[in-house]
Amino acid sequence: MSKNQNLTKRLVISAVFIAVSIVLNELTPIKFPFGGSVTVFSMVPLALLGWTYGIKWGLVCGAVMGTLDMLIGGLGNFAWVSGIVAYIILIFADYFVAFGVMGLSGMFKNKIKNQTVAFGLGAGIACVLRFICHFISGVTIWADYTDGWVGAWIYSLTYNGGYMLPELIITVVGCCAVINIKPIMKALEK
């Protein structure tokens, strides 16, 4: 396959996986009132992109997903904050970076012998980093809705942890399952 064909294939697969991630992101058994939800494996396609094509590619694909998520359903959150700094923190912490870090899921590929463990661990760490992004957003721009800084820390920890802990578990289980589906992994690695 030529270099241009390989790039075209990578772009098409990435676009399809981002689209699948967006659709899965809308399947929300639990949706929180000020953003955030427990989804049905929506982070797995992003994690697969980071695993298959590398961290840099995965970071970009995750940031694209974050941008689309913001445009599709996250614009309502802007009504709750005011000021340019708050908008910038919201855009980066809750969308670009939070979803971008899912591309780090491939960080242990070929570094840990058991690839199921490597992918699951990478996806788990990526989800923890995503939680940290949302936590930072919570203690900075959402602090006005709590009683002081201690209240903001506890609020952000419980609110964001309330959906990110289940999301972490679902993502790790999904990644550990999908890496063992040989036809999918073989098709991606062609």
Feature locations, PLM:
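Internal alpha-helical transmembrane segments of multi-pass membrane proteins
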Residues: 110-131, 190
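Interfacial aromatic-anchored transmembrane helix boundaries in multi-pass membrane proteins
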Residues: 25-38, 64-106, 143
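Alpha-helical transmembrane segments and their cytosolic interface
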Residues: 1-18, 120, 150-190
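Juxtamembrane/transmembrane-helix interface segments of polytopic membrane transporters
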Residues: 21, 25, 69, 73, ...
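Hydrophobic transmembrane alpha-helices
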Residues: 1-60
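Residue-level recognition of pore/gate-forming positions within transmembrane alpha-helices
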Residues: 18-22, 65-66, 127-131
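Structural signal for the C-terminal ends of transmembrane alpha-helices
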Residues: 51-53, 104-112, 177-185
